[in-house]
């Protein structure tokens, strides 16, 4: 069955929630030592990026407040440079970009 853009939007929203859940009660030092959480966050970011690539361009143009291109680029960096992921950049994404993205998605889904 073909998936709709709403399915992909749900995938993104769910991945955002999971990232927040995985990192809710840890500090950077704990994150730095926790390979399982790093791996889970990376996977969720890959899902966000992959789902964003499947959103129709017409829909993306209607919602320029969402960083579609950046989401896809992050996925590409994680997939193709998995051995060189900078954990500091990953943490900054989790703590700064994900909350902002969540707010934008909440508005979009209303």
UniProtKB/Swiss-Prot annotation:
Active-site residue numbers: 75, 80
Lineage: superkingdom: Archaea
GO terms for cellular component: toxin-antitoxin complex
Key words, A-Z: Hydrolase, Nuclease, Nucleotide-binding, Phosphoprotein, Toxin-antitoxin system
Modified residues (O-di-AMP-tyrosine): 82
Keyword Nucleotide-binding among record annotations: yes
Residue window of motif RX(4)HXY motif: 75-82
Known EC number: 3.1.-.-
Keyword Ribosomal protein belongs to the record: no
Top-level enzyme category: hydrolase
One of the record's GO molecular function terms: nucleotide binding
Post-translational modification: Modified by cognate antitoxin MntA; probably at least 2 successive AMPylation events occur on Tyr-82.
UniProt record similarity statement: Belongs to the HepT RNase toxin family.
Function description: Toxic component of a type VII toxin-antitoxin (TA) system. Overexpression in E.coli inhibits cell growth. Neutralized by cognate antitoxin MntA. Neutralization is probably due to AMPylation by MntA. Probably an RNAase.
Protein's recorded name: Probable ribonuclease HepT
Species lineage: Archaea, Methanobacteriati, Methanobacteriota, Thermococci, Thermococcales
């Amino acid at each position: 069955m073909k998936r709709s853009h709403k399915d992909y939007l749900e995938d993104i929203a769910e991945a955002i929630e999971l990232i927040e859940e995985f990192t809710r009660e840890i500090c950077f030092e704990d994150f730095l030592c926790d390979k399982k959480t790093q791996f889970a966050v990376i996977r969720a970011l890959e899902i966000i990026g992959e789902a964003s690539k499947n959103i129709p361009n017409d829909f993306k143009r209607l919602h320029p407040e969402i960083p579609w291109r950046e989401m896809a680029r992050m996925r590409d960096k994680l997939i193709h440079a998995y051995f060189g992921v900078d954990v500091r950049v990953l943490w900054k994404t989790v703590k700064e970009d994900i909350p902002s993205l969540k707010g934008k998605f909440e508005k979009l889904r209303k």
